[in-house]
């Protein structure tokens, strides 16, 4: 439906949803390019997973994903930025939430996609090198530590909640992807 809204219906575009974790990782490893050009993004776990697999990754140069992606992968310039509560993205608007939407520069996106296609070998080699850095810096334990630090930082700013989370209060499991319970 979203693709129809932007006249992007094409038999070559495959939408996969609710695949098994095993198939999902297989697609990330065997795909030629990972594309995540969202208007708004949090941590963007699929992007960091694609990057850790050594897949050339194109992404919007905005939001929380810059925590790990900045200086890596293939960023797409942002054309404009506006408050999320402007409510002009139709039913996909989360206007009650704070934050901004970022409009990717779609001309730049097409240039980047063409460049990756033409120079695929170079981008693949670069992505494989970057994947080593990503896996060393952002394994599950390190990401859980980042999350714990963020939670404790948040709690320390709220006097009525001023009680740091202790390690024995956290349960981390990886059965079907990461799951953190506090």
Q: Predicted segment positions?
A:
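A charged, aromatic-enriched C-terminal amphipathic alpha-helix characteristic of glycosyltransferases
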Residues: 100-111, 118-149
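A short, glycine- and acidic-residue-rich donor-binding loop in the catalytic cores
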Residues: 44-49, 57, 64, 68
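Short alpha-helical donor nucleotide-sugar binding micro-motif in glycosyltransferases
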Residues: 26-31
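Short hydrophobic beta-strand element within catalytic cores of glycosyltransferases
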Residues: 56-59, 74-77
């Amino acid at each position: 439906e979203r693709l129809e809204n932007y006249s992007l219906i094409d038999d070559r575009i495959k939408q996969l949803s609710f695949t098994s974790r095993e198939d999902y990782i297989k697609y990330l490893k065997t795909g030629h390019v990972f594309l995540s050009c969202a208007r708004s993004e949090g941590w963007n776990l699929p992007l960091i997973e694609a990057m850790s697999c050594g897949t050339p990754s194109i992404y919007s140069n905005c939001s929380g994903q810059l925590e790990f992606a900045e200086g890596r992968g293939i960023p797409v310039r942002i054309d404009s930025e506006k408050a999320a509560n402007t409510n002009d993205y139709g039913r996909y608007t989360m206007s009650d939430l704070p934050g901004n939407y970022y409009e990717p520069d779609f001309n730049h996106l097409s240039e980047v996609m063409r460049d990756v296609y033409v120079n695929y070998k170079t981008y693949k080699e670069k992505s494989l090198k970057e994947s080593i850095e990503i896996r060393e810096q952002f394994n599950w334990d390190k990401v859980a530590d980042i999350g714990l630090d963020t939670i404790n930082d948040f709690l320390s700013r709220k006097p009525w909640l001023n009680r740091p989370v202790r390690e024995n209060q956290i349960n981390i499991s990886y059965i079907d992807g990461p799951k953190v319970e506090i």
